[in-house]
Swiss-Prot record:
Keyword set, alphabetical order: Methyltransferase, S-adenosyl-L-methionine, Transferase, Ubiquinone biosynthesis
This protein's name: Ubiquinone biosynthesis O-methyltransferase
Lineage: Bacteria, Pseudomonadati, Pseudomonadota, Alphaproteobacteria, Rhodobacterales
Coiled coil spans: none
Pathway assigned in UniProt: Cofactor biosynthesis; ubiquinone biosynthesis
């Protein structure tokens, strides 16, 4: 069998390597993710609970589930999943992120298997998971379809993938690039490339081509007056998230 070619974009990896030490600083370069994280977690936990019939009010509701956090960064999603009882593997192509993630997990008393690897390498090795968290990654890869095919292969039959990214339209450029990188300086300039953003319809089509069954999509909407994020059923104009299952 021919080895799968990695979809990792070296220039994208270099951007995150340069910021690695700041992952757990809520006022640092990853401030946007810290602000967004409660919404991401609300969506992720509700989707997993619904798909696997888990009661979030119980202790360790995700016990027995194997979860992959691909593009895990410093572990902002891996750690909450571990606290909910899941067996968590955090994978990242940016090796500099992982010492930060490992140290923070150890300090937090959590056991998380952090690996410097790619989705393609894990799929080729035959790794299988109940859930794949694919959050804010697809807009940074060189070939989205090949990448999503690899993440599909990592899912067990009946598994669930949560995938979030950024829409491509004038509003997303104004907010995610000009607003976040130029005006607010939440992120270094060049963190995102507008041409790599993906519309919800494009992402649904890619997920289907990759062998997944898209079942839900929601928007993450920032309110500059309340200075907080919320989940929207209708507004997918900038940040949005999807849920897909594997038959």
């Amino acid at each position: 069998m021919q080895a799968q070619q990695s979809t990792v974009d070296p220039s994208e990896i270099a951007k995150f390597e340069a910021m690695a030490a700041e992952w757990w600083d809520p006022n640092g370069k990853f401030k946007p993710l810290h602000m967004l994280n409660p919404c991401r977690l609300d969506y992720i936990t509700s989707q997993i609970a619904g798909e696997f019939d888990r009661d979030l009010k119980t202790d360790a509701p995700f016990a027995g589930l194997r979860i992959l956090d691909i593009g895990c960064g410093g572990g902002l999603l891996s750690e909450p999943m571990a606290r909910l009882g899941a067996e968590v593997v955090g994978a990242d192509a940016a090796e500099g992120n992982l010492p930060v993630a490992r140290i923070h997990a150890e300090q937090s008393g959590l056991e998380i298997d952090y690996r410097h690897t790619t989705a393609e390498a894990m799929a080729e090795a035959g790794e299988q998971f109940d859930v794949v968290l694919n959050m804010e990654v697809v807009e940074h890869v060189a070939d989205p379809l090949s990448y999503l095919t690899a993440t599909q292969q990592l899912l067990k039959s009946g598994g669930l993938q949560i995938c979030s990214t950024i829409n491509r339209n004038p509003k997303s450029y104004a907010m995610a690039i000009f607003g976040a990188e130029v005006v607010m300086r939440w992120l270094p300039r060049g963190t995102h490339e507008w041409s790599k953003f993906i519309t919800p319809d494009e992402l649904f089509a890619l997920l289907e081509q990759a062998g997944l069954n898209p079942v839900d999509r929601k928007g993450f909407v920032f309110n500059p007056i309340l200075w907080k994020w919320s989940i929207s059923d209708r507004d997918l104009s900038v940040n949005y998230v999807t849920a897909s299952t594997k038959s």
